[in-house]
Structures are given as C-alpha cells and as structure tokens.
Amino acid sequence: EEAARLVSVQPPASALMYAQDKLAMRERLTDMGIPCPAWARVEDEAQLAEFGATIGWPLIVKTPRGGYDGHGVAVAHSPADVSSWWGNGPLLAEALVPFTGEVAALLARTPSGEIASWPVASTVQVDGVCAEVTAPAVGIRPETAAEAQRIGERIADELGVTGVLAVEMFVVGEGADERVLVNELAMRPHNTGHWTIDGAVTS
C-alpha cells in the first residue's frame, strides 16, 4: 500500500487481499452473492463444534493464510482433529462438498477493465495438488462452463483484479441442476493454466 502511493502496483492490495486471506475472500464473495460452500468463521473449538452440528461432520477446516496445495487444509471429523491449529487467529470451516467434478476459470484483466478468458478447464486434484487439467472442460454441461466463466469474470471486475486470475470451483448436482461453487482464488499464473504454454496462442 505504501508503494502504491508512489508507483502503480498491480494487482492492487485491495484485490490481492482476497487471494491471500481465505476468510476475507469468503466474506466478500458471499456479500456479492457468488455461490460458495456453506462456511463459517470459527474462533475456537466450541464454534467449530456448533458449525459441525449444524451442517454435519466431517467438514473442511482451513487456515486463512499461508495454505496452498493441500497445506493448511484438513478434513475434520471432530474439533479434536484440528486441536493444534488454535492460537493464531480464527479458522475457516466449510462444508465437505459432494462434488462431481472440479473446474477452473482462467482469465486476464487489464487495469482499465478489459478481460480475456481462456476456456474453462476441468481439473483433477491428487492429495490437494492439481495433477490433471483438460481444456476445454469435459464432463460438464456447456451451460455450466459458461456460468463458471461468467462468475470468474464478475469476480475479476468487482474485486478490481489486474493480471491473471484463476477461480477454482466445485461442480455439484446433475443434469439441469448442475452448478458450480467457488472454492479458491489465485491472482497469479496458476497450475490450472499451465496447459496454455503449449495449448493456446497466449499464456
């Protein structure tokens, strides 16, 4: 923020915070009406137990900052499973989503608001790490892919993202009920876009 007073810093800190802090991201996307898994900010074991009692166990617990590729993420069957995580601030608790697939919307946005999108890709995660990407996405309805792209572009616009944005999403439901839920954001060249190095005109 101090540097931004002297020179243009892109993406701006006001956008980057939503890729750095998962709680801030969930709060902002929920305020925007973007579809997300059920979630809660939990300050202690009692709040985690209450959330688990409401949505059912197991659930996902994440550290708001510093997690990537499966780090800082746990499947909790009870508060005891993350008992060592307390003491560094609140945690993000989320419903364990019964997804049928995963996709990623990848786009680039200029400071003036122009957006170019690559085809929505389907992804396969192994132990929290992206292991396979297929573009265009397979196994989902064209309408679902179009909705995923619209969501990605809306997030980029409303957060004021510049540069590359990847929006990872879960695919849930079947047939006409198929839809996407936003999992995480990455405001950087992302592994779901590595295919563009050889598979697209621009990368």
Functional labels for PLM-detected ranges:
Residues G160-H194:
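Conserved metal-phosphate-binding beta-hairpin within the catalytic cores
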